[in-house]
């Protein structure tokens, strides 16, 4: 029934040090743990063992390039849509360099697709089902000739981008939408 949560974690290969650096691994795993709680999973895959499993996956695969890591925790079995368990989990990793758009920036449009409201689905959880919302916005942006979409909430305020956070720098200070703007926390 789409009851799953995930994280997207970057690992950056440093050729000079011949070492892979995982970006904020503990923070990401704490968020996947929080997402499980928000989604009311009956059992929780804790952050610590997920961190350990991720480090072990990196060690066994011996990556010598930057990677994208995706841990996922899901409700397993054929229960009712209101089932809270049991859970299953897996972690995937693929080599993935830094996209050129990180350096060049993107052309974005304000989408006609509204960001899901925390009143209808828990937008603050990193749930796979929630990402269909930004998928529609992203498809619209590409069809209209843009690279990405910026989504507004039901109050017409900037919420987030298509699968990304939105912020501006004003006088050296980062300004983001508030946590009450239906953002991913």
Predicted regions and their residues:
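Short, acidic/charged, Gly/Pro-enriched secondary-structure junctions
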Residues: 50-77, 94
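Helix-start/capping segments and mature chain N-termini
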Residues: 1-56, 80-185
């Amino acid at each position: 029934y789409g009851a799953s949560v995930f994280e997207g974690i970057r690992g950056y290969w440093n050729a000079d040090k011949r070492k892979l650096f995982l970006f904020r691994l503990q923070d990401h795993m704490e968020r996947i743990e929080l997402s499980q709680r928000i989604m009311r999973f009956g059992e929780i895959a804790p952050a610590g063992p997920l961190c350990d499993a991720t480090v072990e996956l990196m060690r066994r695969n011996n990556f010598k390039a930057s990677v994208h890591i995706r841990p996922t925790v899901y409700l397993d079995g054929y229960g009712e849509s209101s089932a809270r368990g049991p859970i299953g989990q897996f972690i995937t990793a693929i080599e993935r360099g830094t996209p050129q758009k990180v350096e060049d920036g993107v052309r974005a449009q304000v989408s006609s697709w509204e960001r899901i409201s925390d009143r209808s689905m828990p937008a603050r959880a990193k749930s796979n089902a929630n990402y269909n919302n930004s998928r529609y916005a992203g498809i619209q942006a590409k069809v209209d000739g843009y690279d990405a979409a910026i989504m507004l909430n039901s109050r017409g305020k900037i919420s987030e981008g298509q699968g990304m956070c939105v912020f501006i720098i004003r006088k050296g200070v980062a300004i983001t939408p508030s946590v009450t703007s239906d953002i991913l926390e």
